[in-house]
């Protein structure tokens, strides 16, 4: 019998990139591209339909895992069908409080593009543009930091 070792990753620090999203005109083509380039794994997330049911829309969403991921919950990002040509790669930064970080960011010149929203059973996020127009997201985990 082989002994197994469970690897525990340290909790990321505030401001760490913890998630990214890739909008794709052709999700199958783009998932194939990144699978071949980096070995990433793409798994359809059924939770996206549940989340978006409350928002009166539907969304096909694939969770992205590193090629060496040992659990389907060990994700690094997501892929979805692009809705508008303006949608671009979006990075999510971990924060202790979306509300506090939104206030600070707007004081520093950021523009709120999407107000704070809940991701059921996971946390909250908001999307902003920095003073130069670069889009990014804040993410607060329900599990805390």
Predicted regions: what they are:
Residues 1-31, 41, 88-91, 141-145:
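N-terminal beta-strand motif that seeds the catalytic metal site of vicinal oxygen chelate
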Residues 11-14, 21-72, 107:
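Core segments of cupin and vicinal oxygen chelate
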Residues 70-75, 132-136:
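Short, charged/polar, Gly/Pro-enriched secondary-structure boundary elements
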Residues 25-28, 91-135:
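Vicinal oxygen chelate
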Residues 64-69, 128-131, 141:
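Active-site beta-strand termini and strand-to-loop segments that position acidic
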Residues 50-51, 55-60, 85-87, 119-124:
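Short acidic/glycine-enriched loop/turn segments that link adjacent beta-strands
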Residues 61, 76, 125-127:
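Short hydrophobic/aromatic beta-strand element in the GNAT-like acyltransferase core
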Residues 19, 48, 55, 78-80, ...:
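Residue-level hotspots at or immediately adjacent to binding/recognition sites across diverse folds
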